[in-house]
Amino acid sequence: VLNTVGPFFKFGLPILEASIESGCHYLDICDDWEPTEEMLKLDSQAKDAEITVIIGLGASPGITNLMGLIAMEELDSVDTVITGWDLSSVNPAEESSQTGTNAAMIHGIQQMTGKVKIFEDGRLGMVQSLKGIKINYPGKGIYKANIFGHPEAISFPHHFPKIKNAMNVAHGSKAIDIYIIK
């Protein structure tokens, strides 16, 4: 099964459960932290069914995880992993090419409203979505960013238990203001 059906907070877990029950290998591009947390708990069931399950094979998560892993392998120690996107060049379209609501829109609204889960000070916890933080980027200075709910905050500490902090952010000059729902 190659699952690209979103939003994943609605469809991810039941499709994975059906794949395991059917004995089918499973790949997806899950980009929601809520099902990621539950999907990771199905590891032993997938192993018992002798199937391969790989979740989060998109750009983010996916490529972001690989980039984080490569960076971690180059360092002596890592206590914080922050993935994110630079939105400084984002401009709202004059007219949308979309004729209706799509999974990406629903995903974005879900992850920018309410609370989201991050890994902070060695434990998972809920924080307000779009909470402002400052990131000290070595050799570049301090950047302002906003927390955006995403699976990397769950998957990095799951696979690398020595990490103390993991989160996903959106940053960029004024671009984040486009996405703040007031």
For each feature predicted by the language model, list its residue ranges.
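Rossmann-like NAD(P)-binding element
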Residues: V1-G12
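Hydrophobic beta-strand scaffold residues
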Residues: V1, H25-Y26, V53
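Adenosine-phosphate binding glycine-rich loop
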Residues: A49-S89
